[in-house]
From Swiss-Prot:
Name of the gene: PPL1
Name listed for the protein in its UniProt record: PsbP-like protein 1, chloroplastic
Entry's family note: Belongs to the PsbP family.
Record-level GO cellular component terms: chloroplast; chloroplast thylakoid lumen; chloroplast thylakoid membrane protein complex; cytosol; extrinsic component of membrane; photosystem II oxygen evolving complex; thylakoid; thylakoid lumen
Species: Arabidopsis thaliana
Disruption phenotype: No visible phenotype.
Thylakoid found in the keyword field: yes
Keywords, comma-separated and alphabetical: Chloroplast, Plastid, Thylakoid, Transit peptide
Length: 230
């Protein structure tokens, strides 16, 4: 990953993202936790968190079985993976062969392993007036806010492991790694976010901590494969 590059913080206004463990439908996330900052910027970051909470409360529904229009599928582009390309929303990514599509209200696309429900990938889009991801702030700040406010339940402990910035084809992406500790398991996860054409894109993927060493290379492939296609 590229080294962390900081930029001025700014209020975030994005929607709730994620997946909640279910016996049949696998994973979906909701989050809450504290966002720590220096005293000199506490007022601005408090405002940022309030906007997050308000927006999340409006947009975040739970799992449903509503039908969704399918994305177009490309041929397998890497051994052990299948490719998905959404022409309407202009993004593409790879997911491990054998994962199945599930429908979760509020998520644009979700694939999961039917045997290991914590192994999944989801993509979420919400409107934004920002032009680039950098306008929201530096990678670590934005990742911590997303993890604590969006990507884990409020009763679970979250830990940000790493956050970085990289550019691909002139577009800036933030990538981050984190864990979410529940009572009976810990999920080790990866995420990538970017802004394009009035949308804030979030892709998250992960696995049970006990399977992290086995799955981490595949999950990094998933995160690294996410690209805006325009």
């Amino acid at each position: 990953m590229a080294s962390l590059k900081l930029s001025p913080s700014s209020p975030i206004s994005i929607s709730k993202v994620g997946v909640i463990p279910s016996s049949k439908k696998g994973l979906s996330f909701l989050v809450k936790a504290e966002h720590h900052s220096s005293s000199s910027s506490s007022h601005l970051q408090d405002k940022c968190q309030r906007r997050l909470i308000v927006t999340f409360g409006v947009v975040a529904p739970w799992i449903s079985l509503l039908s969704r229009a399918p994305l177009s599928f490309a041929a397998e582009s890497k051994k052990g993976f299948l490719a998905v390309s959404d022409n309407k929303d202009a993004y593409a990514f790879l997911y491990p062969f054998g994962w199945q599509e599930v429908v979760i209200e509020g998520q644009d696309k979700v694939y999961k392993d039917v045997i290991e429900p914590l192994e999944s990938v989801s993509v979420n889009l919400v409107p934004t007036s920002k032009q680039t991801i950098k306008e929201f702030g530096p990678p670590k700040q934005i990742a911590e806010t997303l993890i604590k406010k969006v990507l884990a339940p409020p009763n679970q402990k979250t830990t940000l492991i790493d956050a970085s910035e990289h550019d691909v084809d002139g577009k800036t992406y933030y990538q981050f790694e984190f864990t979410v500790q529940a009572r009976n398991y810990t999920r080790h996860a990866l995420g990538t976010i970017t802004v394009f054409n009035g949308n804030f894109y979030t892709l998250t993927t992960g696995a049970n901590e006990r399977r992290w060493e086995k799955m981490k290379d595949r999950l990094h492939t998933v995160v690294d494969s996410f690209k805006i296609t325009v």
